[in-house]
């Protein structure tokens, strides 16, 4: 257990901060500043180790920084299941993984790992998803392949069909990994966030190519123990039902 990290206290501090805010800064800006202060203070004790779906530059990496600030030691993992193993095995203090996208729906790898793993959901963070088409080259007409995570391909399917209908679409385990594929070939493009363009030195061929402007992804924070209540908490319930008529009704009846 990480004694010096108290997410329940942080949540109360953030609520008080927003309640007392009369401007000129927006609540989100104040919370971001305080998050960085807390993150820096925690690092003076010992930097938190947080496993995330990597490599650096993924949306999960961005969600980690939004939730924990800039000072934790990020541990990039190749697969969602690896994040769970890092937390379960105490290799990392915490983990963060995507669980649901407003367009693509649930992330099945996360649900599968939740059903078999022994970790707790201790927090959540939602971030807007803005997809960019990135490449080493600068000519959209020269692109022959597009690498991206399957969720990104789904979320940009209309744009891809209209603008790159004849190119080969190749799935990767993360959008940042897709960006690394685009680094060495001007005829290859990747779908990723703007941060990935900076990290991997790529040009933005097209901005905001997602099919819906309301595209967002919810991430869950994983830990080995349930933290104290903050006064603004949620409970997650996961269950499976048999494939027969009335099974879902029977389960929901327990909660009614």
Where does each model-flagged region fall?
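Domain-level signature for soluble enzymes in the chorismate/prephenate branch of the shikimate pathway
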Residues: 1-256
């Amino acid at each position: 257990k990480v004694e010096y990290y108290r997410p329940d206290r942080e949540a109360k501090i953030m609520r008080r901060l927003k309640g007392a805010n009369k401007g000129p800064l927006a609540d989100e800006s104040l919370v971001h500043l305080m998050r960085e202060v807390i993150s820096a203070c925690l690092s003076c004790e010992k930097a938190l180790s947080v496993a995330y779906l990597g490599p650096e530059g993924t949306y999960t990496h961005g969600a980690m920084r939004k939730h924990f600030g800039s000072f934790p030691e990020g541990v990039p993992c190749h697969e969602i299941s690896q994040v769970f193993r890092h937390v379960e095995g105490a290799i990392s203090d915490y983990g963060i993984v995507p669980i649901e996208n407003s367009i693509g729906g649930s992330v099945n790898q996360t649900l599968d790992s939740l059903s078999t793993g022994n970790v707790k959901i201790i927090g959540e963070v939602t971030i807007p998803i803005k997809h960019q088409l990135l490449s080493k080259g600068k000519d959209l007409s020269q692109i022959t392949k597009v690498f991206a995570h399957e969720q990104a391909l789904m979320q940009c399917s209309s744009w891809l069909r209209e603008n790159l209908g004849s190119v080969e679409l190749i799935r990767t385990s993360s959008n940042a990994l897709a960006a690394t594929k685009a680094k060495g070939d001007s005829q290859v493009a990747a779908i990723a966030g703007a941060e990935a363009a900076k990290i991997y030195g790529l040009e933005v061929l097209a901005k905001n190519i997602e099919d819906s402007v309301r595209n967002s992804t919810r991430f869950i924070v994983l830990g080995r123990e349930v933290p104290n209540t903050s006064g603004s908490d949620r409970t997650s319930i996961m269950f499976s039902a048999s494939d027969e008529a009335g099974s879902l009704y029977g389960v929901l009846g327990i909660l009614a």
